[in-house]
Amino acid sequence: MVVVMKPGTRQQDIDALVSRLKELDLDVGITNGVGCTILGLVGDTTAVDMDKISINPHVERVMRVQEPYKKANRKFHPEDTVVSVGNAKIGGGNFSVIAGPCSVESEAQICAVAEDVKASGAALLRGGAFKPRTSPYSFQGMGTAGLDLLMEARKQTGLPIVTEIMDPRMAELFEREVDVVQVGARNMQNFELLKEVGKMSKPILLKRGLSNTYEEWIMSAEYIMAEGNENVILCERGVRTFESFTRNTLDISAVPAIRQMSHLPIVIDPSHAAGMYWMVEPLAL
């Protein structure tokens, strides 16, 4: 349920209504937009009498939200969320590039790539220290040693680092050392992991699963936000289709669709979608 306050409503009147709503065992999210304040009500609203809220002299209108996602819903938060990482801003019309190797393989490799990334104008450095692989015999990443190398590259370049978490038990380490925590496509519906990263203070980059719908994707973001972390960045990285020319098919339509459905920022990963270097630039453009 969404409650839109009348323009110019005093803060004390907003606080009074919020207090009454919380007495109904509802979680009340407050969004101060341009010209008005919006209250997003999360919880069991089925027994809430909309008319009793509507008659409040400071309420403009009351709307029920049919979608299962609430905190991530554009109706709850009409303005774009902007996530700040170092000097970079993601969302709200800001342009930022995240670049780096798929996996960290050596100090020389990651530091050289980091310097190139910085020189090219990218704002964040990504690199995999822990790698989810289809085959158990494939390289699984350097683990904590790779994370140490990412931290060294950050020290040399000043670029914030983005890397993937796979195990909820690593949350404390990532909270301490990583600037943006990535949840990969294979873990998009690992709900225990989502709950754990939701307790973190660091921004979360949530990749879309191989065959997940927009609603399922946003619901995964909702898991994170329900735990208190609202700094979620959605990442479209390609979906599985019948086409075999590319590794995956980049779903360009996800960008305008998500922007209409949610206030969360969305970025695309053309590298993992295409799997071919020469397609990265045209897909990104």
Protein language model regions, located:
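Alpha-helix-loop-beta-strand connector modules within alpha/beta enzyme cores
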Residues: F139-T163, E196-P203, I252-I266
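Active-site mouth loops of central-metabolism enzymes
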Residues: G8, F95-A112, S135-Q140, P160-E164, ...
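Catalytic beta/alpha-barrel core
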Residues: K6, M142, G158-D167, D179-N190, ...
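Glycine-rich, proline-tolerant flexible connector loops at the mouths of alpha/beta enzymes
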Residues: R126-T144
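Short, well-ordered coil/turn segments that N-cap beta-strands
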Residues: G93-F95, G121-A123, K155-I161, E177-D179, ...
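Conserved, mostly hydrophobic/aromatic
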Residues: I53, G100, L125, F174, ...
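Catalytic alpha/beta core domains of metabolic enzymes, predominantly
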Residues: V85, M200-L285
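Non-catalytic terminal accessory/regulatory regions of metabolic enzymes
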Residues: M1-V97
